[in-house]
Each structure stands twice: as structure tokens, then as C-alpha cells.
Amino acid sequence: ERRLTDLHEAFRRGLMPEQLHRLTGIDPWFLDNLARLMEVEGRLRSFTLSELPPELLVEAKREGFSDRRIARLLQWPLDGDSNLSHDQVIRQRATLVHAARQAQDLRPVFRRVDTCAAEFASETPYLYSTWESGPCESRPSDRDKDIVLGGGPNRIGQGIEFDTCCCHAVQAIRAAGQEAILV
């Protein structure tokens, strides 16, 4: 954690990715991406929500910035009369960022991962969300749905018990006549 904070500070002080690569040995790919995120942060800091250009909001979302992070970075008028905690203020501001996105019809779309390399149709498509423009490829149904939350990333040697449990849960949901969504 400290290393990332130090990199953040080094970029803030003007060091370039090439310099940091020589000093740290960190792969330039990671440093270039971190520098790009810092550059977006810097641009966000120069706007209020009402001044924020829609294309910068889209760029921030594409780069993975949450509404909460955007709310932390934007300039806000001083509110000396507020009895809210800092966290409550940030949550309130994140709600305003979310509302601004909705007003601009800025929402993620879902795309399909072709797990069969176009060799044949996949019966269990994988979807991912993206802020890229284009059509949404999900096909929601009117059926009742249940969500199965997977165990997340596994490390080598952990075993496949979590995957097996998720598969059995999905099979049970389908047997009950409902649609299963595995996250």
C-alpha cells in the first residue's frame, strides 16, 4: 500500500514513468496506466459538477473511477452549515454525480465474451460491463432471477470447491424454474 502512495506522490511531483521505472523496476505498462489515471484525476480536480464536461465524465468512468471517487475529486462550494460527517457529505455528493450521469443518459452497457471463438453458439454467455459506446448485448428476460455470488479470484492451489458450489447453486435455481445470474 505504501508503494502505491509513494508512486502517487512521485507523479504529483512531476516524475515521469520512465524515471520511476529506472528507480523502482516497476514495469512501464503499470506506470503508464497509473500516470494516465493521475492525469484524469488532475483534470477532474479543476471542475465543479455543473462545469464538468460530459466527455471527461465518460473518460473517468471508462478509466474505472467510481461516482464516489469523482465526487471526492471535483470542486464543491464550501458548506459551513452542514452537520453531516465527511463520509455523509461524500455519499451525498456521489449521489449528485450519479444523478448527473443519469441526466446525460450515461450508463454502462453489457457486452458478451465469445467463449467459443465463433466456432458455435454459446449457451451460457459471459457478460462484462463497459462504458464504451455501442449497443448493450445483454438480453434481459421477464423471468424471476436469483443471483449467485462467486468466491472471487482464487489463488493457485486453493482448489475448485467454490466453483463447484456455485455450479450446484445455479443448477438448483434452474431446477426451481428461475433464471440464475452468476457474479
List the model feature ranges, each with a label.
Residues 1-183:
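ATP-dependent carboxylate/acyl-activation modules
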